């Protein structure tokens, strides 16, 4: 196997990884501490003095974490026994074994960025679970819900579009169906712009009707493998026997508006018979500010169902029905909130890898998935995506992301360098997007 390049890390002063560790992560921790402060009276109402003491304890643990980060202290093992604690601590030992540092300790700015950023969110969770009776509290819940509420007009526009489309779907010829599929894929792509971890937890909602912007946004799609997705799924549809299934898996990213765009796409896949089942993979714990948990998934469907617009509530009712019928299935697994790159999945989570192998197509949403797919490494821009996956090929897969990290592979020779010369922030601003496919053609 070819030599893999070094990991992105905070060692590179001025890099996006460096600025994330130096500025964005402390900002997120400060916001989490503030959120706990603001819920003090709620904790008192629900749990009395015990709730207030728990809030103080959680804040103290989080303040300690912020100090460790800002002073580049060694990264310490997790202490609270949880289902993944041992795996995390083994991974920390593994990272330490790779170091040349004189004291052999992993530190925030010298360890791989992917590891320390995941570790920070896992330590936030540890601070909460160490603080009963408020150990159920999702410190990011408010901002996820706000993102959904602030995107209402866009949600209504998408639900209306979908319901009108479903009415006429049987009359569409193959090219028209393909056009609609491409449209909803692009909506799911641009929905990925709404990422609260990039904005430091500040509002990042969708206030304009993305449907009307698709033509204008096309030049910003750097890699467009939508044709491969169409030919794969339309071929599955044509060759499917009566009782057989076509499974599309969506490895989710953000809750709120982006999740709505993913559910709209999933609805279309069933209505068009391009798929017979859609499986969603989310996070087991609150993660990267806006990532989807089972609570977020169920909450959002409930909100859409009770929306004050007939097509919106029709979508919500349909989605609830899909879940009941088993046509939509939500899964979570601890692997998605571990620091490992995905090429380690067969060893670390063989059960999950075996599950993914049952898919006809896996859609990986967003930046964190892309970073884990490619190992978050300093790849050359023109390295083939298949190579950067480093042996991770459970099923045909496609990554759908707007670029918000200094990693991108599979570009034409010179394309990345050209963008870098004209627009230095091209790969971190969320302005550009990709549909990047790996699988049989």
From Swiss-Prot:
Chain positions found as N-acetylalanine: 2
Cofactor(s) in the UniProt record: Mn(2+); Ni(2+)
Motif (Subfamily III RTxK motif): 401-404
Gene3D superfamilies in the cross-refs: 1.20.930.60, Uncharacterised protein PF01937, DUF89, domain 3 (3.40.50.10880)
Catalyzed reactions: beta-D-fructose 1-phosphate + H2O = D-fructose + phosphate; beta-D-fructose 6-phosphate = dihydroxyacetone + D-glyceraldehyde 3-phosphate; L-glutamyl-[protein] + S-adenosyl-L-methionine = [protein]-L-glutamate 5-O-methyl ester + S-adenosyl-L-homocysteine
UniProt keyword annotation of Acetylation present: yes
SUPFAM superfamilies, per the entry: AF1104-like
Residues found modified as N6-acetyllysine: 40
Residues annotated as binding Mn(2+): 253-254, 291
Pfam families, A to Z: ARMT1-like_dom
Positions contributing to S-adenosyl-L-methionine binding: 258, 291
The keyword DNA damage belongs to this UniProt entry's keyword annotation: yes
GO function term, MF aspect, one: S-adenosylmethionine-dependent methyltransferase activity
InterPro entries: ARMT-1-like_metal-bd_sf, ARMT1, ARMT1-like_metal-bd
Description of post-translational modifications: Automethylated.
Function of the molecule: Metal-dependent phosphatase that shows phosphatase activity against several substrates, including fructose-1-phosphate and fructose-6-phosphate. Its preference for fructose-1-phosphate, a strong glycating agent that causes DNA damage rather than a canonical yeast metabolite, suggests a damage-control function in hexose phosphate metabolism. Has also been shown to have O-methyltransferase activity that methylates glutamate residues of target proteins to form gamma-glutamyl methyl ester residues. Possibly methylates PCNA, suggesting it is involved in the DNA damage response.
Domain description: Subfamily III proteins have a conserved RTxK motif about 40-50 residues from the C-terminus; the threonine may be replaced by serine or cysteine.
The family this protein is said to belong to: Belongs to the damage-control phosphatase family. Sugar phosphate phosphatase III subfamily.
Protein name as catalogued: Damage-control phosphatase ARMT1
Organism annotation: Macaca fascicularis (Crab-eating macaque)
Gene name of this polypeptide: ARMT1
